Amino acid sequence: MPDILVLCYHAITPRWPNELAVDPAALERQVRLLLRRGYRGMRFADITSPDGPPRRLAVTFDDGYRSIAEHALPVLGRLGVPGTVFVPTAHVGSPDPMSWPGIDDAARGPYADELRCMSWEQLEELAHRGWEIGSHTSTHPYLTRCDDAALARELEDSRAAIVERLGACATLAYPYGDTDRRVMAAARRAGYDLAAALPVRLKRPAPMGWPRLGIYPADVLWRFRLKVSRPVRAARVRLGGAALMEEPPS
């Protein structure tokens, strides 16, 4: 069995003191470390390919912050690693800052620029550079709280928007890592091939619930080394994800 490691970042910026914002230099150190250990970077959609290398790394980004294009794209470009960004399509190109639970008015004030989503033109540039653009639903809701009709709209409309602009959309990341069997079944019906979960809630990887490791500013290099080690990753899966090195919500 291949060793598949999927990382989840959010904003990549030195300017926003928030638990979702990782410094670009930290991103570069972390990915370089894994490349030295023999991992090969690939898009999230490709991690289950039968022809892939024995050690596979997918670097993913949730929410589509503009800082991903500004800072993460050049970092991963230098390292020869394609990224995957999951975008809430209702926010793409909006001049308004995005707003999630935990981001209060004070954060939206001085750091409003950091909370804006990329434009379709920026996403097209990422795709041109070999990145994958996946869905993070339309409006970023807790999917398990949606009724069946709203759930289908969130999954289908976001995928359709990406397909219309970029030609393809095979993958999904659940907002807040919030999923269950009903949501996963709806994701498959909506046409997704692979979906990312965070935090780890499943006992084993599954196409509609693939585990990721959330990476945050607190993950300095020694902690990052521990977090990505195979024994710790295996323990997190056995314990259901939240009991070891607990992470903020996505």
Description of each model-found segment:
Residues 86-88, 136, 197-198:
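Generic beta-sheet signal
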Residues 71-89:
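A short alpha/beta connector and helix-capping loop motif
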Residues 10, 136, 140:
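Histidine-centered divalent metal-coordination motifs
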Residues 93-113:
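Aromatic- and acidic-residue-enriched segments that line the glycan-binding/catalytic groove
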